[in-house]
Structure formats: C-alpha cells, structure tokens
Amino acid sequence: MTAILERRESESLWGRFCNWITSTENRLYIGWFGVLMIPTLLTATSVFIIAFIAAPPVDIDGIREPVSGSLLYGNNIVSGAIIPTSAAIGLHFYPIWEAASVDEWLYNGGPYELIVLHFLLGVACYMGREWELSFRLGMRPWIAVAYSAPVAAATAVFLIYPIGQGSFSDGMPLGISGTFNFMIVFQAEHNILMHPFHMLGVAGVFGGSLFSAMHGSLVTSSLIRETTENESANEGYRFGQEEETYNIVAAHGYFGRLIFQYASFNNSRSLHFFLAAWPVVGIWFTALGISTMAFNLNGFNFNQSVVDSQGRVINTWADIINRANLGMEVMHERNAHNFPLDLAAIEAPATNG
C-alpha cells in the first residue's frame, strides 16, 4: 500500500493531466479531441455573437459596396447574418495579422473566415470525441459515423463550395435570411432541385422524419401496461430495468396487417440500424451533391426537351423551373454583374447603319 501511494505522489503533472482528460468518470467527457474542440468552438461562438451584434458592413462582392449584417447596423434576428469574406480576398487565408488594421479586416469580412474555420475544426473534433468516448466505454463506433452526415454537410457549404467557386464570398452567410439567400442563389446557378443527390437527401430527411414518427407512435401504442388509469404511462418505466417496456410482437403484428407482413421489422436491432442509416445516407449524398456542384457539375437540364412536329417548344416543368432560375440569377448580385452568364450574349448584336 505504501509503494502505491508513493507512486501516485510521484506521478508527473502531465500524467495526472492525461488521466483526467481521458477519464470516463468526469461529468462531461473531455478526451484528446476535446482539448482541441473546446477552444475552437468557444472561439467560433464568441466571435459569432460579437460580430452578429456589432460587426460593421462588409464589402462582400469586392466592389466597394458594403453590406450590413449586424444588429447594431439596422438588422433584426431574421435579417441579420455574418457576411462572408469579401470576393477581393478570394480563398486567401485572412487572419487579423494579414490585414493592415482591424478596420480593414472587418471591412473585408475577416470574422466569417475565422468563425467558419474554427467551427469546422470544432465539429470535426466533436465527432472524434464521440468516437473516443465510445471506444473508452467499449461501445461500437456508429454514433460518430452518424454525426459525420451533418459534419459533411457543413463542410460542403462552408468550405468545399467556396473552394470550387474560388472565393469565400460564395460561402453560406451565417444567418437565417442569409441561409435562404444562399439556397435561392444555389438553385439559380446550379439547378440543385434537379440533382439526384439532392433528391436522395430530401428522401433521407423527410423519410427519416416519417420513420421516426412511425416508430415512436408504434412503441407508444404498444407499451406494456404497468400503471393504473389514474397514472401516467411513463411511470411504468424504471431506468435500467431489464424487462421490455413495449411489446414488439404486437407492434410488428399491427404494422404487418396495416401495410403487409414484410414491411414490418421483426428484429429490433435491424430496425434501429435502418432508422439511423436512412437519414444519414441521404445527407451524405446531399453533401456529395453540393461538393460536385461546387465545381459546376450541376443538376439535370431538361430545358426545351419537348417540341411539336413544327419544332415549336412545348414547355414542361423543367422550362418553368429554368425561367425561375433565370429570374433569381438576374436579381442576385445585381450591382456586380450587368447580366448573369446565362443571359449574356456570346456576340454583340449586329446594328444597321
């Protein structure tokens, strides 16, 4: 016993730090990924809050026409946003020390790069921390795998898309209306609604919502009665109990008769794998779609695909969508371009006289 106490006392400060960092007895697990996650997410969050409240207007298009995004410069919670870094900066790494002054850094949208790069590093470390805690507890690694879907989606819109388009100014603004503006412009320039990977993402999100509601309602409807009519059904469950809290056979029988037998899972493990995999795979595909459209491999183009015997175009919904795309493209960045590329003439029209 004496030897053990002496060994503990002689343990280095670094050793005690390592044990504390990797201990699963802490109220919140830190882990080695947490060592990087905590400062990066704190930095991103702090700068976001300060910039959302007080950042001056940013010259997003690089044409000396600053755009206001903060609350103190006339915005509200819905219209406010962290304006992306200026097109004049492009993809250059733009920390504070690269600018001539803090005023110049703010004018060129430096906070956007700072927030986005710290945020992406932070959420990637959060994913690693999920794996690390699972590993230390002897669990399987699928929690981190599932979280990789939103990490991939965030990386696609904040990093891959700006790289493909050549400027951080094309990244998604950090705000409510800025997100909607990004979506509208993305549709105008890339026809994302006609991209099969986006369709898979929609199926993943809507399907995941449907399956979650179906599963929750089936379980809630087939609980094993443990309470009286005067008590909440929730009182019939005790945390950690070994007995099943609902009758999976009853749920399986109900759903099998409602649809057909093989539409219902008879294995709880495969059911829950399916519930996790469906939305995750869908969002993976959407992130992959954004990453390919970043390099202008766009959605399907079926414009003017149907013509009559005289060669006249019979409009389809694809043509209606195309007309909407052109309208949206005309309206965005209206001071930076005379015409969007789709509407610009290849050659100047001939004139008489």
Swiss-Prot record:
Binding site for [CaMn4O5] cluster: 170, 189, 332-333, 342, 344
GO annotations of cellular component type: chloroplast thylakoid membrane; photosystem II
N-acetylthreonine carried by residues: 2
Record-annotated site: Stabilizes free radical intermediate: 190
EC numbers for this chain: 1.10.3.9
Source superkingdom: Eukaryota
Catalytic activity entry: 2 a plastoquinone + 4 hnu + 2 H2O = 2 a plastoquinol + O2
Membrane-traversing stretches: 29-46, 118-133, 142-156, 197-218, 274-288
Comment on bound cofactor: The D1/D2 heterodimer binds P680, chlorophylls that are the primary electron donor of PSII, and subsequent electron acceptors. It shares a non-heme iron and each subunit binds pheophytin, quinone, additional chlorophylls, carotenoids and lipids. D1 provides most of the ligands for the Mn4-Ca-O5 cluster of the oxygen-evolving complex (OEC). There is also a Cl(-1) ion associated with D1 and D2, which is required for oxygen evolution. The PSII complex binds additional chlorophylls, carotenoids and specific lipids.
Any GO molecular function: chlorophyll binding
Entry PTM: Tyr-161 forms a radical intermediate that is referred to as redox-active TyrZ, YZ or Y-Z. C-terminally processed by CTPA; processing is essential to allow assembly of the oxygen-evolving complex and thus photosynthetic growth.
Site (Tyrosine radical intermediate) residue list: 161
Assembly and interaction partners: PSII is composed of 1 copy each of membrane proteins PsbA, PsbB, PsbC, PsbD, PsbE, PsbF, PsbH, PsbI, PsbJ, PsbK, PsbL, PsbM, PsbT, PsbX, PsbY, PsbZ, Psb30/Ycf12, at least 3 peripheral proteins of the oxygen-evolving complex and a large number of cofactors. It forms dimeric complexes.
Species of provenance: Cuscuta reflexa
PANTHER family to which the protein is assigned, alphabetical: PHOTOSYSTEM II D2 PROTEIN (PTHR33149:SF12), PHOTOSYSTEM II PROTEIN D1 (PTHR33149)
Protein name according to UniProt: Photosystem II protein D1
Propeptide stretch(es), residue numbers: 345-353
Binding site residues for chlorophyll a PD1: 198
SUPFAM superfamilies recorded: Bacterial photosystem II reaction centre, L and M subunits (SSF81483)
Residues the record lists as binding Fe cation: 215, 272
Matches recorded under InterPro entries: D1/D2 (IPR055266), Photo_II_D1/D2_sf (IPR036854), Photo_RC_L/M (IPR000484), Photo_RC_L/M_CS (IPR055265), PSII_D1 (IPR005867)
Membrane protein topology class: Multi-pass membrane protein
UniProt keyword terms in alphabetical order: Acetylation, Calcium, Chlorophyll, Chromophore, Electron transport, Herbicide resistance, Iron, Magnesium, Manganese, Membrane, Metal-binding, Oxidoreductase, Phosphoprotein, Photosynthesis, Photosystem II, Plastid, Transmembrane, Transmembrane helix, Transport
Any GO BP: response to herbicide
Function: Photosystem II (PSII) is a light-driven water:plastoquinone oxidoreductase that uses light energy to abstract electrons from H(2)O, generating O(2) and a proton gradient subsequently used for ATP formation. It consists of a core antenna complex that captures photons, and an electron transfer chain that converts photonic excitation into a charge separation. The D1/D2 (PsbA/PsbD) reaction center heterodimer binds P680, the primary electron donor of PSII as well as several subsequent electron acceptors.
Protein location: Plastid membrane
Disulfide topology: none
